[in-house]
UniProtKB/Swiss-Prot annotation:
Protein name per Swiss-Prot or TrEMBL: Putative ATP-dependent RNA helicase ucp12
PANTHER family from the UniProt entry: ATP-DEPENDENT RNA HELICASE, ATP-DEPENDENT RNA HELICASE YLR419W-RELATED
Motif DEAH box, residue numbers: 703-706
Bias (Basic and acidic residues): 18-41
UniProt subcellular location: Cytoplasm
A single GO cellular-component term on record: spliceosomal complex
Keyword vocabulary terms for this entry: ATP-binding, Cytoplasm, Helicase, Hydrolase, Nucleotide-binding
Domain UBA positions: 276-315
Every Helicase C-terminal domain range: 797-968
Amino acid sequence: MGSKGKKGKSSEVNLETSKNKEKNIKGKKKNSLDPIEKNKQETAGLQTTSRPTAKQLVGGSSWTGKIPVVLLNEHCQRSKWEKSDVKVRQTKSKNYIFTSVVLAKKDPKNPSILDHVSLIPPKSYYENGYFPEKETLVEARNVGAVYALHRIMSHKSLQHALPPEHRNIWFDMEKQKKEELKNKHSWLYNEDPFKAAKELQAARASSAAKPPPKASQKNEKVSLTSIKNTSLSHFSKFNFKYALPIHMSLENRRSLENLFRNMNTWDILEDTKNLEPDTSIVNDLISLGFRDIHAKEACQYCVSLEDALEWLIIHVPEDDLPTRFLPSDYTTGISVQNLNSANLAIHYNAKRISETGYSFDLCFSTLQTFENNIQISSEYLQQHLIGESFDGNISLEPNSTEWDDDVSALQSILDNKVSKIENGCRVRIDYPTSEFGELFVDFRRPARSYPAHIPLMSLSSTKRMASYIKLSILKKMVVYAMDLRGECMLSWLYNHLQENIEDFLQNIGSLLNISAATIGVSLSSQNKSAPTAKKNNSFKPKLFRRSRELSEKLCNNWSERVKSPSYQLKVREREKLPAWESRRKIMDAIQHSQVVVISGETGSGKSTQVVQFILDHYLSSGEKDLQTVVCTQPRRISAISLAERVAFERDTTVGKEVGYSVHGEKSISKETLLEFCTTGLLLRRIQQHGLGFLSTLSCVVVDEVHERSIENDILLTLLKLVISRIPNLKVILMSATVNSDTFKYYFGNAGHLHIHGRTFPIKDYYIEDFAPKLNEDDDEEDVPRRKKKEYEIDYHLISRLVSSIDAELGSSSGSILVFLPGVSNIARCIREIKSKDGSKFEVLPLHASLNTSEQRRCFKTYTKRKIICATNIAETSITIDDVVAVIDSGRVKQIDYDVERDLVTFKETWASRAACQQRRGRAGRVKKGICYKLYTRGFEEKGMLGQTPPEVLRTALSQVCLNVVPLVKRFSSAGNSVNQGSIKKFMNSLIDPPNDATVDLALKKLIQVGALTVSEDLTGLGEYLVSLPIDLKLGKLLVFGSIFGYLEPALTITAILSTKSPFLGDDEAREIRSKQSQGWGDVLADARVYHNWLEILETRGVKKTVQWCEEMHLHYTTLQQIRQNRNELSEAAQLLELTTKKLTGNFDWYSTENLTVLSTLIAAALSPNVVKCVYPDKKFVASFSGSLEMEQEARLTKFYDQNNQRLFIHPSSTMFVNSPNASRCTFVAYEQKVETTKPFLRNCTPINTYGMILLGANDILIDPLGKGLILDQAYCIKAWPKVVILLKMLKRCLDASLHERLESSSGLNYESEIHQCIRTLIAGNGV
């Protein structure tokens, strides 16, 4: 890029036209040869055996192609131009460098005329070293030829025809071209430089001929010194020509103003109380039209021009704002509303009183209180102005002679200055300026007796005077009058005002002192606290450090317990486990290495015994400061069942020496020395307390590391980073199928030990072995079918297989474990088994969604044979002792990342061979077992993966990076902030790090959705999303739905988006879906249908519901899956306790207000997947009642993304045929973008402008000086400055409430008011 100013122009094109004869041209060419002859002489003077050719000088001895000058002249010849002329000059170092390239061509109408174009590179090209100095003229001219070739032929890959050195120059020019195109200098690279030069010259001439626009006060450009290097200084680059306009009603403006004033957002700055305000800010505010006293007052609360502008626009009444901050059509007065006859009279009187300066809302409410009595209401307002109490239970008192006498006396003194008005008189006041025209003060009889009570006073003028100025003067008059009570005072009041009017006008007083009267709020409300959080008194866990006395007590208790017969009996049972034989080796390895990897086969007892060996070692060694041993498990049920088993083996109860902690449940005490917990819980503790927590532990045992979950990988990375700082901390990694080399290499010098298992023989049966016996047609030919996505589990086959196994076992005890992929599969399988032999079996589900008590049922003994239908939760850790047979479907629901939909999903797929081996091992724990596999031998060998890929490599990294942020923050060097780049550095340190590009995309998405700041700190929303175990977009929808009181519909929509539309794909289904939409888009149409289906199912039964689904072209199974997903999401939302307000009654799916807000919440969740709508020009048709606007076709509406690329609605969308309503649809949110013949948008939802501003946009740039807002650096919104400031502050309050909602269950003061304002603005689009 070129430098700024004249030298900074990207290039200089000079178009010269001259009339020269052919002989002159030839003479010029002849002269141009002189430097070449000179160069020949210089070359000849070299003491060499042979003189190099031009090709050898330019391209080297091995170059066989053409040199750049030849290529340029050949192009000129083909284009019928004259031969190029490369200008060269000699440098101080006696070398040569080219300065420009002159191209010429004959005028086709007059061949004697030549047009010239000079291609001159900017100075910065030389400063950056793009054009090196050359020893000879020939070499310098060829460098210039490359520049000229790039200017006119950069659209071609000409670099391949250039010598190697000149290719590099071409590549440098390509980089510069990208910058020039960004700066809209595309004319530089026109194939025809003569045409480009003429167009540029014409454009410059046209621009110079245009008269400068007339400046108005509103649009007058003001030079502000205090906004340099702020967001205001970068606002001019956006084009507001086609900006979307927004409006905000007077009622909504007042609601927001009252909210912000009541919140007392601005506290006076302690360090500015006794200091002069910033002169530059004050001067800038004055230049913008604000009063000097107001500017100085604003600086008491603000330290920047932007903040001061906000303060002033909120606190200065609209009728005193500078005109640049008001819309062109702004008029003072009261908005017209639909009023009944009673309220109409009050409305009229309120308008009369408000002309004296009081807020119309305050006047209206006061008149309502005092039954539309003007005198009593006016007296109340006057007392309210100075904060005096007022007894409203008064009646009008009879007229007294004192009032009439005082009025007459005043009239006799002032003569023609006094005129009579109703119930009083009006007196003209003289003052030195004419700013307000003629100034008058009105004195009216009070409602109570005079002179015991002061008269009613008001100011008026022939020119506009701001309400707050009137009230400021009036307040001083009322205070003065209060000291005159009991004597006639009109003349005193007049004299006081006349003598001090100049001082009153110059020293108007603080804006805040009279805010009660101008905005209609009580003085007490101004004293409310700032938006601090209502902190709850809930217990916040603190670090627990065990005292020496307690440690000695625990050691003594253990010493006594190990001597008991019951303990010894259990030890003898433990000695039968293979792990016991390796006890000494295990402890030796742990003592000699800080990190030890222990692998053990199924049944070895590693999960129950290793932790006990470690605990017994510390207890027997007489440690004075006993520290806790923590063992992590991937699942809640694993942690609980292991804690119960180990507590039993140690002859104690759970919660004492051995305990557990899982999400929502724990059983630990001060005596707990061995704690089983989930990996996520341990990560949260580390996040809370960092190294302080880890220093309270003696050992961290990470079990089931082979599963390679994200939480396990993150935990291992954290431990690797901190173990060098906590040398006494031991780290043990355990698994049945662990690749020890991977972890040994990762931790450097980690020790390793393998424990052989104790399992009974297991007989394997593949589907080709048992299917024929069960009369099922399933053999090797089914392998291709099973590989397909549409493969479905044969539940009938499982049911018959269960009956067959039961018959084979006969009277032998033992349960059957069936592995299935998901919850819905389990439910269907249970129904199938119960429908066949339900009375013979105790059929139980086992999956992570069940609560602890339901999961524990699987470990109990029953009189009937136990059939357990489980997910992969039962593969490891959980041991159901009486399992003798396993039925393996081979399927698993696995986290996967759908790139096209940008959605994290639980996708059903084939399990790995390692996982199936773990399932098989469940059958041989107590005796010989059998394993039935619902797949063939060939498919197991060829169709299954050997190992399940690490979760970090098969999920959306945006979610992973978000979860990493709090942990990186805890261990960052800055302490309170995450250093930019820390997240990527952490991700690169994982066992299997993802590539940098993937992490960059993830971080970019987090910033776009509003979860991270640019500096990689969590926003308020981000703190919520960290706690939600679902995809970002769906989590965002649940958060906003919960906070705004729309949790129930948000759960439905989240479930639909995580599944798919329940409609079939035929044309009839599209038509029905379009009717259900009613212009509200695809997602809300699906949600409506789901709730209709649910209502019919509950009222009419399954049979009628299935018939209804067929009529509506709905997929019944999909609707069931949506319901299942919704139930699971509902449980997750309840655990987070996010709800701040619940809607009363059932959600109305046909309420315009509800659907407007709900569609905005959807857009907030899908952001930044939002496009702008551009409607065609309106067309009208004549009718008997006048011109009517024609309804436009949907296809005429255009949609543009942030990059101004046009996108199209997919034909399957309801918005493809239904033209959106322009009044409620200025933007469209979409779930998925696909590209076939065009880029299409699927699952669209329309939103209005206010919805986009408040919730749909993640980045908002505002210009309080007059233009409006920029959403996401792309969409321009035109609004008058006061509305801009109000919206900015509302967005700020929303983010603050999100932050506080996570910190405190009570949240912010005024939180409900903030959310109500947002709902109101979105529902009415500001009106």
